[in-house]
Amino acid sequence: MYVIGKLEERLVEYTVINNIAILAFDDGKANAVGPQFLDDIDAGLDRAQAEQVGAVILRGREGIFSGGFDLEEFKKGVELGMTMVGRGFDLLVRLYSFPLPLVAACTGHGVAMGAFIIMTCDSRIASRGNFKISLPETAIGMELTPLLVALTTARISRQHMTRVALQSEVYNPEQAVEAGFIDEAVEADLLDARAMEVALKLANLPQAQYAANKLLIRANTLQAMNDNLAEMAKR
């Protein structure tokens, strides 16, 4: 086990099993996406690429994958809050274009930024249970950015797009499969084994072609996401 980073409320563990890297995040709370979380996930992705692993699994803690951005960071001032948001959006682009196969092991609730991270992954498996997966932006009075809309449009089924992105409908894991948030839901005690099974299968595909074809089939979405990042950088 390699601990990527640890501050007061942040811990990301990097492990490699069967040449599959597992990035497991657990802050003991909501797995909020804040500056240290972003540092640690980026470091883990860098390490996975440097070690040339076959695939990467992103895993939350039991009961929650991630509850979204760290609201405490916004209380420190607009500039710090917007810097965190910009870095979070950079992470979404990196994940969605990541050259290695990327598997989400959704261990529980996946809300807001947590749900967007799940959507960036190539294969997404969730634990069954009384968990919420949703985009609450409308419900909490926030506007979606073009970057988020592009990602959501690419992943969420057309039949559910209005309910997901506009009406902030809350889905349980089984419902989230139909909506397009995730690909399959399994019993909690089977989640890690199933995520590893999928990761190993993807790792056996030709890596160069996997990376190239990922960029090709996601080119339009990534262009829209990067265009929005460029606009944000001008502000």
Language-model features: where?
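Amphipathic alpha-helical segments at domain termini/boundaries
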Residues: 2-24, 164-204, 212-224, 229-235
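A structural preference for short, pocket-lining loop segments at secondary-structure junctions
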Residues: 18-26, 37-78, 94-104, 123, ...
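Hydrophobic alpha-helical segments that mediate membrane insertion or helix-helix packing
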Residues: 23, 41, 58, 117-118, ...
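Histidine/acidic residue-rich metal-binding segments in metalloenzymes
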Residues: 34
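Short, active-site-adjacent cap segments at secondary-structure transitions
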Residues: 63-66, 110-112, 220
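Glycine-rich phosphate-binding loop at the start of an alpha helix
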Residues: 68, 82, 89, 112, ...
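A short acidic, glycine-rich active-site loop
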Residues: 76-86
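Crotonase-fold acyl-CoA enzyme core
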Residues: 96-205
